């Protein structure tokens, strides 16, 4: 396995390069990089990996300098091959961003105006022509720079009691320089996952040299229920005279945000939410089903492997089907260990019958997995799917009709019992469903009320905007009338 430790990149962030060619075990962090940037850190037992291909943050355990548990899952999810070359860039404390630099390529030539580091481009095979090797290196370098520039649109903002009290938060110097936000004084918009925007001021701290935003940071955090001690990922969707930052997904540390800085580490645990992701990640949130006769006969709905892999389904588990009216139908995902396939074993036939879905009809389900809750497959409209797949959408608007409350869903479920199967193998796979506790129902009711209030706030802001536009139009009409009167007087 090739070893290419590098001290710094064009962005002045430490990184190292590893080739997967001919490897027989998990990757090892180069000794030079480990000594310079990681040695001596307390509690160095695991790290975090991110990539442009997924919004997920992957936990990888460390056995000394060698990657251990979690690396195989990361490799499988990103379809890594033995001729890939990976760039590991240290973004924040123990969080590495992984970028592929191409196939069958042994080294990357890095150059900077300051001349921090410069390495030669050599091919693995000694018999190759020098000019061909340089051409390949330049192509791989351009691809690496393009992929790195796309990742520079993202930033992690830590929420602390201090920046809530001051009503401001600072960007990293690298993010500010990469996106031209240094020494600027303008308005900037923060957008949440529902498409609502808050206007803040972008300012520059002359003492620290950092760019920061202030004004409505506390209001944005409270409205979106962001918790102190957490890191949240934002994407720079629009730059220019008025930049726009959109909340992508959140990452919650194991310890407090302010304490992590003192301890010299940021232990981050993974959490999912709806985000901008790659096109493949967005598509794999949706499961499109064309109802066939053999599906009804077998009572099984097979799930494609990419859908299972991208949504973290690793074993048999309960799942809830939610129809277009918000009614929930308990189901169960079973697995075939021999074929390594997953399928829904029961419940979904009753779901189709109740929603009057006929053989030959096509419908789409959206996968939603909350923290510590049973995953759901929600009936999705075509308009919502098109909006999710649009690359420049400002965000997913909230539904106009509020979700049915938990009590209604629970009562409807009692009227729609699951159809039992005569197959003894399926009966063995079934597991008893646990009844919903009062606290779970209270959480659902609370979430329903929050969704209604959020929708009301959004509609209220839209009405206020339309009202201001109408008032401006009336003023223009009055001004035009005055001008017409003056012209008539002159003509008379």
UniProtKB/Swiss-Prot annotation:
InterPro entries: B3_DNA-bd, DNA-bd_pseudobarrel_sf, REM_fam. Its main location: nucleus. Residues 12-104, 154-250, 286-382 bind DNA. Keywords: DNA-binding, Nucleus, Repeat, Transcription, Transcription regulation. Residues 385-395 have a biased composition (Basic and acidic residues). SMART domains: B3 (SM01019). It is found in: Nucleus. Pfam families: B3 (PF02362). Residues 117-131 have a biased composition (Acidic residues). GO terms for biological process: megagametogenesis; pollen development. Residues 105-134, 385-427 are annotated as: Disordered. GO terms for cellular component: nucleus. One of its GO terms (molecular function) is DNA binding. Residues 105-116 have a biased composition (Low complexity). This is B3 domain-containing protein REM3. The gene is REM3.
